[in-house]
Amino acid sequence: MKKISYFLPLLMTLIVIFSCNKALHLPTGSTPVKFTNTTYDSLATYDMLGKPSNLVMPRDSISPSLTSFIFDKLPKAADNFKAHPELFTSTSNATLNFTQKTDITITFVQETALYLSTVGFYTFQTNNPPTNPNQITNIKYIFPNCSALNSGGELVPGDKVDIGTYLPGTSMGFVLMENSYKPATHSIYTNGNHFCSADILNPENDPSIRRHVVILDYPTINPTLSLISFEDTDRSNPTNDNDFDDVTIYATQKVVN
């Protein structure tokens, strides 16, 4: 009996060690990414439902052709990760890269997200993209609550914000902070999931499913219009639909002299 009592704990220990080692080689689930070196700024004040006070008027008119372009590229509730693999290659762009001095406005298009999430941006030198969250020193909120009217927020299609002028050699990444807006306290929770343009900053353990941001260039010349669309939940979750149209905005890029 003594031999059995010594043997069982040893067996259990070996099973645990084997399981842990095996788990290290299986990229399942996700690991929280902490942005401990990041400061957060709002471009303007915002009301209790997270609508910013710096909306530019008149708002943009969302044309039927633009709406059709979005739905053709990213149909709702479809697995667009499988349907459009060309959008998710390692070389497909999820950032804006400025080669000339450029004015940027960001326009809200639509939202069908599960939560009240915040959309913001960060900048970096094009030749030095971020490789870890400590390199994201500042995130600026564009839409503190990027939720539509009658969907937990007050945004309507065409609402837009001027986010400034950027110089050549600068790049801009976007971030959706999942379930971050708290209307009861008029605050933004910064310790939850950040889904960023840079795949390496996202929480999924499997690198092949870390993409959360898709940028599509709409056929215009100057100003250039780039659609930015988000997948708003952890993609390692089996309930995730991979449609990448939970929140859609666009950036209008106007080259200035």
Q: Can you name each region flagged by the protein language model?
A:
Residues M1-Y6, N21:
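Positively charged n-region of N-terminal signal peptides that target proteins for export
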Residues Y6-M12:
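Sec-dependent N-terminal signal peptides
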Residues V16-S19:
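C-terminal motif of bacterial Sec signal peptides marking the signal peptidase cleavage site
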